[in-house]
């Protein structure tokens, strides 16, 4: 029975780690789109230094979250049971440890998401940001004929 409990704890951990990885990927994807829009504005002469600084902070937060996720993925939760009378408390300690570790990752991802959100808000403050385009260097169809 105890082995089944540990297997379930590790399965929960694995599922949560996968969800955290997906969340980190989504946050990073959104940040990438924000940076691309900021690059368009920069190419058109707009000062985006505050966006760049905010994006760098967000990248650091995402990297920190990913390192926590990687560390958690390598952990295997188990406990050495000293006596049958202590079984319940030993299992509770292990479960609390797992919950604490997962909560740290969740808070780290929330912090990264908030930083990306702040970067997006800073980008939105630039007037007419959607009008900026980067000139393409491709040749037209008529030039090839």
Describe these PLM feature segments.
Residues 17-62:
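Amphipathic, heptad-repeat alpha-helical segments
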